Amino acid sequence: MKISAVIFDLNGTILEDEDEYGRAFNQVLKSLGVETSAEPPQIKGIGVKENWPHLIKKYDIKTNKSLEQLAHETQEAYLTEINNVTVRSGFDEFVENLKDSGIQIALATSNTWEIAEKVLNKVGLGVIFDAVTTVEEVAYGKPDPGLFTLTADKLGAEREKCLVIEDSASGISAAQLAGMKVVAISGRDEDEQILASADLIVENFSEITAKVVEEL
């Protein structure tokens, strides 16, 4: 079946920013008295706010701060890192190839619009998408399929004709629950087992073309 739309995740998929978010989380953890390793402590594919219950439990954190406040502090720390954020190799060429083939492109992110807009504008991708959906627009984040089904509705695209490009297990699950094909972007060797249920796994956008997408 011919794919009519490609829906991209943002953080860790279009953007190589796992380490930048890791430093942001670690900065807030340090302010709470937690010393962590240099490794990013967050769970990929879920929102910043949604990460904090996991981190509070993992590090047995005692704090009066709300999840909203912890998320706000994390996002503020991330914004100090956005000069270091880069676009994944091959993305611009892949998008141009999709557009030349008449395939719509959209963004579905677990992030907020405020943060997504700032980082997209910073890396020069602020106006390329036919539709954008952020976590504020749905009742539940990934792995719930709502982000992707709403995005398909915005595009006027049939769900089974949509392809999602993701970098996390929760994102892959969400796309599959939405009835969509999935390409997984694997940034680290250890990710491939986690991403194994995807229809295709690649390391960067240089490995895929509109022709590959249409044949999935």
Residue ranges with predicted function:
Residues 3-92, 96-101:
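N-terminal helical cap/lid subdomain that shapes the substrate entry/recognition surface
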Residues 35, 104, 181:
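Residue-level detector of anion-binding/catalytic polar loops
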Residues 1-4, 96-99, 112-113, 117-216:
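Asp-based, Mg2+/Mn2+-dependent phosphohydrolase catalytic module
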Residues 87, 108, 140:
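Residue-level marker of regulatory loop/turn positions in helix-turn-helix DNA-binding domains and
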Residues 13, 109-111:
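Conserved phosphate-coupling serine/threonine residues in phosphotransfer and NTP-handling enzymes
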Residues 41-42, 60, 81, 106, ...:
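Short, flexible active-site loop motifs that bind/organize anionic cofactors or intermediates
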Residues 106-107, 184:
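Hydrophobic beta-strand core positions in alpha/beta domains
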